[in-house]
Amino acid sequence: MSGLFITFEGGEGAGKSTQIALLASHLRNHGFDPVITREPGGSPGAEAIRHVILSGNAETYGPAMEALLFAAARADHVDQLIRPALAEGRIVLCDRFIDSSRAYQGVTGNLDATYMAAIERIAIDGAMPDLTLVLDICAERGLSRAGKRRGSDTADRFEKEDIAVHEARRQAFLEIARQEPARCKLIDADRSQEKIADEIRSVVDTILTEKGLL
């Protein structure tokens, strides 16, 4: 795959969607045509599964079944959108990917790491991110942001969970970033949007320069 695959990870209210939009604008200013996508979702099949997951209907079947649903959505997303875009040399910006499954289903769902690694390997079939930006913010602050962003809309099932669960996920993301420093860049998300965006642009521009694309 000849393109560049960048994923954004972090807890609720970390600002992933905002930073994806800002980075996409920056890339367009440099002549790129980035693909913006999300998980769960990003392809027709994956979006159908997204509705089942976020509605809470999947909770009935337990975390193992839910992890398989995420994996099925991811496999379709990779095959239908991500892999073809990368083959065309596009830059793909994805809101959540494998690390969210590791944190949400693996850690707080108490699923075995071997089980999670097996379904991850099948779902992505080699489509690992070139760069993962882990936006870090304490759980309480992130949930406050998410509530303000949501306004009068109903919180999804993940936002409704206890603060301790959200903090456990935060620690899971931090551990992933610590274990995979070559892929993951930890970003302090408890700052202004502009400062966060500046750091992200710097990281991405460095990679593009190294690849001779900028």
From Swiss-Prot:
SUPFAM superfamilies (alphabetical): P-loop containing nucleoside triphosphate hydrolases
What does the UniProt keyword field contain?
A: ATP-binding, Kinase, Nucleotide biosynthesis, Nucleotide-binding, Transferase
Q: Which Gene3D superfamilies match?
A: P-loop containing nucleotide triphosphate hydrolases (3.40.50.300)
Q: Which reaction does it catalyse?
A: dTMP + ATP = dTDP + ADP
GO molecular function terms noted in the UniProt entry: ATP binding; dTMP kinase activity
Per UniProt, where does ATP bind?
Answer: 10-17
Q: Which Gene Ontology terms describe the biological processes this protein takes part in?
A: dTDP biosynthetic process; dTTP biosynthetic process; dUDP biosynthetic process
Gene Ontology cellular component annotations, sorted alphabetically: cytosol
What intrachain disulfides are recorded? none
Q: What is its EC number?
A: 2.7.4.9
Q: Does the keyword Nucleotide-binding apply?
A: yes
Source species, domain of life: Bacteria
Q: Which family does it belong to?
A: Belongs to the thymidylate kinase family.
Under PANTHER family, the record lists: THYMIDYLATE KINASE, UMP-CMP KINASE 2, MITOCHONDRIAL
Task: Tell me the function of this protein.
Answer: Phosphorylation of dTMP to form dTDP in both de novo and salvage pathways of dTTP synthesis.
Q: What is this protein called?
A: Thymidylate kinase
Give the originating organism: Brucella suis (strain ATCC 23445 / NCTC 10510)
Q: Which gene encodes it?
A: tmk
